[in-house]
């Protein structure tokens, strides 16, 4: 018979959100046990890989404020763990007026400095970029790259330093909700806790459903490509919103690896819970090379590496964060949560503690999109 242990809070899933949450809760004096089926950096997980983009250019002030909090959180983590986590190159957003106007309005309202550029201005400042007469650009300095592998190591150390017990790999097999506590059954033991945070990425929907909580989540398979393009390694990150309203493209430099580019949507290929790796989609890779030829025609598109990993979409692309006592949901990261890691950890910890936050309306489990919408793996990310 497996052992039974008692703790204040169990965190299921130790990706960027789970680790950040475990650290935040432990710092507040809670006893915390975190478990993860795979372990940090495993290719089956959403938080794997060398890098993620970081930016404050969002079309909602709440996201901008959360991104600014995250920047400060990453800097504190760099100092406490004595490791470089951010490469701040700035970011340029390209696209039509309606989208860029919304980004500018949200940044202006939160006192973020940025430069607005017409097509000629983009060409002068960023000569590697080809832009059309109907396009504009926004540049802000608070953009660049999170060194994701290093960040996961730093977050693991931070949570452990705060007193959290982290167990990887340890698979959760059941969540059993009782009137005054929750039992989390793993392949090794039974954990009894007052609260449980479910931050299990694409496995979250199935876990929550089995515990009686329904959230519209769609696991998806995402793909990223790294280009061997040394001339871009000191250039800013880019988000291309595209004039035709199609799926956008983002890119950013990754020291020692290459220039990372990806479409901002998941694949239609089904995600399966026991698959550990996916072969590259060469058609998608060719599409990125074609985009590069249009946007950066002087850059020779030499592909260094293509990787795939899962993520989890909501119907509207906003996160699913909230409480269904005694469960705390931290899911539906929709392909753009990593940058917010430390800030999301504090936010989810506030949810667990019953603290009100403005951002919670945006991520509410009761918002119409989650109650009546249908999440799709290939939903383009509009954020």
Regions inferred by a protein language model and the residue ranges of each:
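Beta1/beta-strand and adjacent pyrophosphate-binding region of the FAD-binding site
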Residues: 3-17
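Core beta-strand elements of the Rossmann-like FAD/NAD(P) dinucleotide-binding domain
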Residues: 5-7, 186-195
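Active-site substrate-recognition segment that forms the wall
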Residues: 23-27, 84-86, 202-325
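Glycine-rich FAD pyrophosphate-binding loop
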Residues: 27-46
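Dinucleotide-binding Rossmann-like beta1-alpha1 core, especially the glycine-rich loop
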Residues: 51-125, 248-249
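Flavin (FAD/FMN) cofactor-binding and adjacent substrate-gating region
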Residues: 94-162, 167-168, 174-179
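Conserved beta-strand-loop-beta-strand element in the redox core of flavoprotein oxidoreductases
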Residues: 173-191
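C-terminal catalytic lobe of FAD-dependent flavoproteins
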Residues: 294-383
């Amino acid at each position: 018979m497996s052992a039974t242990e008692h703790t204040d809070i169990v965190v299921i899933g130790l990706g960027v959100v789970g680790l950040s949450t475990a650290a935040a809760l432990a710092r507040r004096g809670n006893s915390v046990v975190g478990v993860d089926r795979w372990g940090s950096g495993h290719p089956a997980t959403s938080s794997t890989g060398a890098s993620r983009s970081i930016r404050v250019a969002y079309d909602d002030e709440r996201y901008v404020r959360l991104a600014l909090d995250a920047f400060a959180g990453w800097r504190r983590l760099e100092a406490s763990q004595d490791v470089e986590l951010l490469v701040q190159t700035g970011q340029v957003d390209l696209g039509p007026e309606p989208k860029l106007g919304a980004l500018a309005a949200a940044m202006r309202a939160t006192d973020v400095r940025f430069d607005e550029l017409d097509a000629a201005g983009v060409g002068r400042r960023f000569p590697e970029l080809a832009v059309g007469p109907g396009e504009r650009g926004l540049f802000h300095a608070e953009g660049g790259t999170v060194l994701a592998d290093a960040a996961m190591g730093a977050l693991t150390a931070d949570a452990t330093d705060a007193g959290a017990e982290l167990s990887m790999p340890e698979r959760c097999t059941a969540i059993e909700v009782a009137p005054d506590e929750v039992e989390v059954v793993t392949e090794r033991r039974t954990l009894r806790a007052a609260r449980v945070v479910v931050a299990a990425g694409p496995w979250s929907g199935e876990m929550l459903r089995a515990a009686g909580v329904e959230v519209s989540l769609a696991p998806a398979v995402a793909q990223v490509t790294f280009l061997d393009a040394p001339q871009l390694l000191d250039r800013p990150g880019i988000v291309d919103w595209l004039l035709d309203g199609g799926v956008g493209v983002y890119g950013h430099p990754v020291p020692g690896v290459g220039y990372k580019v990806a479409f901002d949507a998941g694949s239609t290929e089904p995600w399966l819970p026991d698959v550990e790796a996916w072969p590259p989609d060469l058609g998608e890779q060719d599409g990125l090379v074609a985009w590069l030829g249009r946007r950066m025609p002087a850059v020779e598109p030499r592909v260094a590496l293509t990787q795939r990993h899962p993520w989890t979409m909501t119907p509207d692309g906003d996160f699913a964060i909230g409480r269904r006592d005694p469960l705390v949901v931290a899911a539906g990261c929709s392909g753009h949560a990593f940058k917010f890691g430390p800030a999301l950890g504090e936010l989810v910890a506030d949810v667990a503690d019953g603290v009100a936050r403005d951002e919670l309306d945006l991520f509410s489990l009761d918002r119409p999109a989650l109650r009546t919408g249908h999440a799709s793996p290939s939903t383009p990310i509009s954020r």
